[in-house]
Amino acid sequence: MPQDQQRKKQFDPNPNRDDSQRKTPVDKEIDDIIDEADEIVKRNKEQAKKKQPSRQ
């Protein structure tokens, strides 16, 4: 894997760009879906805590 990363850096026409500028619209859509999934997981965990009877 490190060789692939070095190769990408070596052939990058503009190495000064950061990752956010390299993203394609599909990459941005994937990030949005991942963020949405993270929110759903977070909400589900909170709801599960509320439904769980408190142990005393």
Curated annotation (Swiss-Prot):
GO terms for molecular function: protein tag activity. The keyword tRNA-binding does not apply. Residues 1-33 are annotated as: Disordered. Transmembrane segments: none annotated. This is Prokaryotic ubiquitin-like protein UBact. There is a cross-link at residue 56 (Isoglutamyl lysine isopeptide (Gln-Lys) (interchain with K-? in acceptor proteins)). The gene is ubact. Belongs to the ubiquitin-like protein UBact family. The keyword Cytoplasm does not apply. The lineage of its organism: Bacteria, Candidatus Yanofskyibacteriota.
